[in-house]
Regions:
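NAD(P)-dependent short-chain dehydrogenase/reductase
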Residues: 152-204, 209-211, 247
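NAD(P)H-binding glycine-rich loop region in Rossmannoid oxidoreductase-like domains
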Residues: 38, 49-91
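Glycine-rich NAD(P)-binding loop of the Rossmann-fold in SDR/ketoreductase-type enzymes
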Residues: 87-95, 137, 141, 145-146, ...
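Mid/C-terminal beta-alpha module of Rossmann-like enzyme folds, strongest
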Residues: 190, 215-264, 271, 300
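Glycine-rich Rossmann NAD(P)(H)-binding loop
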Residues: 173-175, 196-203, 228-238, 260-263, ...
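Conserved C-terminal active-site "lid" loop/helix of NAD(P)H-dependent oxidoreductases
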Residues: 209, 239-245, 259-291, 298-304
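N-terminal Rossmann NAD(P)H-binding glycine-rich loop of SDR-like oxidoreductase domains
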Residues: 5-25
Length: 304
């Protein structure tokens, strides 16, 4: 994709930052966030991204340009232990509706949701039609339910304003500087325990940064009205136990896995719809994680 104009929200987050940087090579990209970290802003600007200090939930959207082709909405509130449900709904759902109402003339709207909106079902691969629930309740009580609310708002706005839309339910994203496998890698390096749910093995469908970037481009091409809801994940299912064991082997250490009910449950994905719409991912998880280990990548949220 070349010569298009993008608005990317939540641009200091792991996924949004990578998307913005990659898109900026051939497109005009405006990234909005609070930018409390000067280094995060500098990294984006060095890649050619125009950074705008902006709170999408509270600031006046009229301050932004009006000629974007695409809006990639990845900003969210997700705080461990948070119990302010009203604020979570306001930020994740209501403010998303205002964003879509303001930019209703765009070519497509991309909404980043989460597989934690599903009701946990053990090792069953979760289809897009699976019952919804609250998989993050023990870790972040407001997150899953506010994302369910946000999906409802996005569906309404897509249909009401006629905006081609994709609701992408992310499973486990990871890359050079973020994601669950990176948190586990840091724990392995420091000899710290890795906490997993007792319902072992903990299956997921992790997707690396290079793959999820290509997926976004393909999803924008199939955005529709009504909104298309799709799992956003890797084509391969693998357990956290297996990837921890693999990275531990590469490091020459032992993985200290501790099972606790406080860890969120696994969310393996059914990939049939995703494959039918945008095809398979290209990178084997072992290859991607080996690169992370060898390059010394680490997650900013890693254990101390």
């Amino acid at each position: 994709m070349k010569g298009k104009k993008f608005l990317v929200t939540g641009a200091t987050g792991q996924i949004a930052r990578y998307l913005a940087i990659q898109l900026a090579a051939d497109n005009t990209v405006h990234a909005i966030a609070r930018f409390s970290s000067a280094s995060a802003r500098e990294r984006l600007e060095q890649a050619g991204v125009t950074c705008i200090k902006f709170d999408f939930a509270n600031d006046d959207l009229a301050q932004l340009d009006s000629d974007y082709n695409y809006v990639l909405h990845l900003a969210t509130t997700q705080e461990p232990g948070d119990r302010d449900f009203d604020n979570a709904i306001e930020v994740n759902a209501v403010a998303t509706g205002r964003l879509m109402a303001h930019f209703h003339n765009i070519d497509a709207f991309f909404f980043s949701s989460t597989c934690s909106v599903y009701a946990p079902d053990g090792h069953t691969p979760l289809k897009e039609s699976h019952p919804l629930g609250d998989a993050m309740r023990s870790h972040c009580p407001t997150y899953s339910m506010s994302k369910v609310a946000a999906e409802a708002v996005v569906k309404f706005a897509a249909e009401h304003f006629g905006i081609p839309t994709v609701i992408a339910r992310m499973n486990v994203a990871y890359g050079r500087d973020g994601g669950l496998p990176l948190i586990h890698l840091e724990a392995l390096r420091k000899g710290k325990p890795i906490y997993l749910n007792p319902q072992k093995p903990n299956y997921f469908n992790p997707v690396c940064d290079e793959d999820y970037y290509q997926q976004v481009l393909k999803m924008l091409a199939v955005a529709s009205t009504p909104a298309l809801v799709m799992n956003w994940c890797g084509s391969e299912q693998v357990s956290a136990e297996e990837w921890c064991g693999y990275m531990a082997e590469l490091l020459g250490v032992e993985a200290n896995i501790v099972y606790t009910d406080n860890a969120f449950p696994c969310t393996p994905c059914d990939t049939a719809l995703m494959h039918s719409k945008i095809g398979r991912t290209n990178t084997h998880w072992r290859d991607a994680m080996k690169v992370l280990v060898e390059n010394g990548a680490g997650d900013v949220r890693s254990v101390g």
